[in-house]
Amino acid sequence: MEKLNLYQRIYKAQHLTQLQSLEKELKDLYGTLPREVNNIVLKRKYEILCTQPFIDEVKDAGGYVQIMLTQEFSAHIAGDQLFELVNRLFDKPQLKYIKNEIVIMIQTIGQWLPHTIELLNELKKMDEQSRHQ
């Protein structure tokens, strides 16, 4: 599969299930994904997760990524669980409460991208659980 076609297929994925299916296909084809391809897959996962309904906005804030959770999600999330999760994944994260929204500030150093993907996946699970109660 030529690189351009591969990258286009990754960026055309609109849902995590599509991306996971493509990732499985690539692993079956190539074995371990080359670092460059893996980084593109990670970036696309992050982009897709940033469009979840519990996220109000995500901003690049000069050395940090700022994730603003919606007022609705901020009102019903278990703050202690969020605090524990964020502090387990990141060194020196910042949590703020602005205009009834929880804001998470994460330094964009080291393994910030895979850890942020893990954070967003966990928040997605919390959101889904709260909607089924």
Locate predicted features.
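Accessory helical-bundle/CTD segments and flexible terminal tails appended to RecA-like ATPase motors
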Residues: 1-133
